[in-house]
Amino acid sequence: MKVLVNGQLIEYRKEGGGPAVLLLHGWGATLGTFDQLAAHLVKTGHTVYRFDFPGFGSSPHPGAAWSVGEYVDLTAAFIEKMKIKKLKAVAGHSFGGRVIIKGVATGKLRPERLILMAAAGIRPKPTFKKAAFTAIAKTGKVVTALPGLAGVRQKLQKKLYSAAGSSDYLQAGAMQQIFINTIKEDLTEYLDEITQPTLLVWGEHDTETPLSDGKIMQQHIASAELVVVPQAGHFVYDDDFGASVTAID
């Protein structure tokens, strides 16, 4: 289904009946990533809402270089558009968790409960790899723009960005500037503003948003519980759906 929200055409789903739950997907994913979780929540008596963020799935690119703040505003407007008066919980994975953190901390999202699965938002300390990514990304734009290199532009960029260790940036395409705007924002200071009960679900072997991020969030969010799923990675709800659902229930 489609709905116009803040001037953006949004692909969304609404299923079930009962208390409202909103699911927010991660970077590069779509609303379909939560098919299994949505089905479970519907069976347990919930109305489940989910949508493709602008620039992902079937929702067009927003047309501008958005930051996390614009995605928060879009999410708040979606809730209003759906006429959700009381949101029992909002659950998000990775980038979706980033949107939840900023949205709740600023009072724009007001769920009764938060479920953050491998949530992004903690900016890592500078490392050689991160510095290399920044330098190589800039160099890549300059080098591949030189006369005579037009034919090898894409291949050279791929090698440069892969050397920098950022497949997400390489795969971002038209979303590259939004990706940059997103990852450069550290949300640590926002965590202290969250007062709602918060469940943190983390994969033991997550390398994208490491378990140390979950522990930092647990320290800063007053009513946070951290559940670590053994052997699971970044996509914790796929790697061990049973353990993830048990924690959420």
Question: Residue locations for each model-derived region?
Answer:
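Gly/Ala-rich beta-loop-alpha elbow adjacent to hydrolase catalytic centers
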Residues: 92-96, 100
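Conserved HGGG/HGGXW glycine-rich cap/lid loop of the alpha/beta-hydrolase fold
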Residues: 8, 13-58
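Conserved alpha/beta-hydrolase "acid-adjacent" motif
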Residues: 207-213
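Flexible "cap/lid" loop of the alpha/beta hydrolase fold
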Residues: 101-106, 111-145
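Conserved alpha/beta-hydrolase catalytic His-Asp/Glu region
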Residues: 127, 139-196
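Short beta-strand/loop motif that positions the catalytic acidic residue
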Residues: 194, 200-202, 206
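Post-His helix in hydrolase/transferase enzymes
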Residues: 238-249
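Active-site loop/oxyanion-hole signature of alpha/beta-hydrolase fold enzymes
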Residues: 43, 47-91, 246
